[in-house]
């Protein structure tokens, strides 16, 4: 069997394009490989945000959305737009699963709890959805409505939670019932790297109403956290309970609506509420009517309000149907993105699909090790390219995004330099086997490390375009005006394969 010449796609997570060098970790890093590719190879810029990826206009892209669009080869309307539309149409307020959970709790005189990432960030959740759910619970007769706020500071400025908390305090005052019952940073409640000691702190706060602190109001608790030098993301578990208020600990028969719609950081805390769980020993395990807003994983035996919209003939499925082999490879932090999200929400491998996982380093925050596990990842990727086993390879380097999120500029520069070195090795390997390579990003981040409006640290993604570079033996030029959903059709065309009718993306070269 002759060696295969792979079509590789390397996704540089968080590597956006911005001409201005000010506070731009990518432009100011020493990146001779990427500089040379942008100067000498076919290249263009493509859109990775807003309506072009199925998000609201102007909304920054993110990894889940980016990989879903890339793999689908069509614009995929994201849960954010889908749920917002349902609220506007009135469909949300009549959602059978939400209605049943609320009504059951109301009939039994029990509480309705809502938890989720409380911010307008729009990556994992949107506070507008939580607002609508609180209003819905109140309208359906719930008297005890408890809101458990996971604070952001990652997809939003590091100290921006106060506006959101005030908004909900005002809502409860207007309704004359319900209250904010707890606050905790997403570092604890939304871990995705099996740091169960963090998750346990959030779980105890929810189920036992036990935190490290108790304050009368959420805003007071937040100000105390800032005084302890804890930004939103890292706020320690705090119970909110004024004198004379009853505990909001979760009880048998209560309803719990988890209002995050993005799966990867919702899974761990959700699994703590499922009978079969071994992450830590639970001090309490209330029997709740738990509703996931969307399906976080097929193997979680809980109901969800908005089931997955199935995507037919994604890039991975189409390759599989054509009898081709493919490899998906990344570090822990972005492994779900090159597998589950890239496959349109399909958990299992397609026939002919292999997966390799490289463990991300166990550090508190990635500015402490900006290169992450890029060397080991590249060793495996280069070996895979040279193996002759794969028709297609999809790889993600997480550094630009994961280190960009820390807000530590010097570390982000080092992260970009580490990735550039790795890309040099990948390009060399592709040329050696006469393969083809597209280099792109799923969204921006590291190109803007200071917020131009506030002058503070910028830890969030951007809505700037991302590069697309071709390395290979075809004499092509890349078109302008493309978007992430054009990549799958482009790769199929480069591989001389048919493009399924389901893919509405365009081929980006001529």
From Swiss-Prot:
Cofactor: record remark: Binds 2 manganese ions per subunit.
Active-site residues annotated for this sequence: 63
SUPFAM superfamilies hit by this protein: 2,3-Bisphosphoglycerate-independent phosphoglycerate mutase, substrate-binding domain, Alkaline phosphatase-like
EC number(s) given by UniProt: 5.4.2.12
Pathway assignment: Carbohydrate degradation; glycolysis; pyruvate from D-glyceraldehyde 3-phosphate: step 3/5
Binding site for Mn(2+) 2: 13, 63, 442-443
Catalytic activity: (2R)-2-phosphoglycerate = (2R)-3-phosphoglycerate
Binding site for substrate: 124, 154-155, 186, 192, 262-265, 334
Highest taxon, organism lineage: Bacteria
InterPro entries per record: Alkaline_phosphatase_core_sf (IPR017850), BPG-indep_PGM_N (IPR011258), Metalloenzyme (IPR006124), PGAM_B_sf (IPR036646), Pgm_bpd_ind (IPR005995)
Gene Ontology MF: a single term: manganese ion binding
Keyword tags: Glycolysis, Isomerase, Manganese, Metal-binding
Top-level EC class: isomerase
One Gene Ontology CC term in the entry: cytosol
Cofactor(s) this protein requires: Mn(2+)
Residues that span the membrane, as ranges: none
Chain residues that bind Mn(2+) 1: 401, 405, 461
Annotated family: Belongs to the BPG-independent phosphoglycerate mutase family.
Subunit structure: Monomer.
Job of this protein: Catalyzes the interconversion of 2-phosphoglycerate and 3-phosphoglycerate.
UniProt name for this protein: 2,3-bisphosphoglycerate-independent phosphoglycerate mutase
The species this protein was found in: Vibrio cholerae serotype O1 (strain ATCC 39315 / El Tor Inaba N16961)
Name of the gene this protein is made from: gpmI
């Amino acid at each position: 069997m002759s060696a295969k010449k792979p079509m590789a796609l390397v996704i540089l997570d968080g590597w956006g394009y911005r001409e201005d060098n000010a506070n731009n970790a990518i432009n100011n890093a020493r990146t001779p490989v990427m500089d040379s590719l942008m100067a000498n190879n076919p290249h263009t810029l493509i859109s990775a945000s807003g309506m072009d990826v199925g998000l609201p206009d102007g909304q920054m892209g993110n990894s889940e959305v980016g990989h879903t669009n890339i793999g689908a080869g069509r614009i995929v309307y994201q849960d954010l737009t889908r749920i917002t539309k349902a609220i506007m149409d009135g469909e949300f307020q009549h959602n059978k699963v939400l209605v049943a959970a609320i009504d059951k709790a109301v009939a039994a005189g029990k509480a309705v709890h809502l938890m989720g990432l409380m911010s307008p960030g729009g990556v994992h959740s949107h506070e507008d959805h939580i607002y609508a759910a609180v209003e819905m619970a109140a309208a359906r007769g719930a008297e005890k409505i408890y809101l458990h706020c996971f604070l952001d500071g990652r997809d939003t400025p590091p100290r921006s939670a106060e506006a959101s908390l005030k908004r909900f305090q005002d809502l409860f005052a207007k309704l004359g019932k319900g209250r904010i019952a707890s606050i905790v940073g997403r570092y604890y409640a939304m871990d995705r790297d099996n740091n169960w000691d963090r998750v346990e702190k959030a779980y105890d706060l929810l189920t036992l109403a036990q935190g490290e602190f108790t304050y009368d109001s959420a805003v007071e608790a937040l100000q105390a956290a800032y005084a302890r030098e804890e930004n939103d993301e890292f706020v320690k578990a705090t119970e909110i309970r004024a004198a004379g208020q009853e505990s909001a600990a979760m009880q048998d028969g209560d309803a719990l609506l988890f209002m995050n719609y993005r799966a990867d950081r919702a899974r761990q805390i959700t699994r703590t509420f499922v009978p079969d769980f071994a992450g830590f020993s639970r001090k309490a395990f209330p029997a709740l009517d738990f509703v996931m807003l969307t399906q976080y994983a097929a193997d979680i035996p809980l109901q969800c309000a908005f089931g997955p919209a199935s995507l037919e003939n994604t890039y991975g499925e189409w390759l599989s149907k054509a009898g081709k082999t493919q490899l998906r490879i990344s570090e822990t932090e972005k492994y779900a993105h090159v597998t589950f999200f890239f496959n349109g929400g399909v958990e299992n491998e397609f026939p002919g699909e292999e997966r390799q996982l490289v463990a991300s380093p166990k550090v508190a925050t990635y500015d402490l090790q900006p290169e992450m596990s890029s060397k080991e990842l590249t060793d495996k990727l280069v070996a895979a390219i040279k193996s002759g086993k794969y028709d297609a390879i999809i790889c993600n380097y997480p550094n630009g995004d994961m280190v960009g999120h820390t807000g530590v500029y010097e570390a982000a520069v080092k992260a970009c330099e580490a990735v550039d070195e790795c890309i040099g090795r990948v390009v060399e390997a592709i040329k050696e086997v006469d393969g083809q390579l597209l280099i792109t990003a799923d969204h921006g981040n590291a190109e803007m490390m200071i917020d131009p409006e506030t002058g503070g640290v910028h830890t969030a993604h951007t809505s700037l375009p991302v590069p697309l570079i071709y390395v290979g033996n075809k004499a092509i030029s890349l078109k302008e005006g493309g978007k992430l959903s054009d990549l799958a059709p482009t790769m199929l065309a480069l591989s001389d394969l048919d493009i399924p009718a389901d893919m509405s993306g365009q081929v980006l070269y001529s």
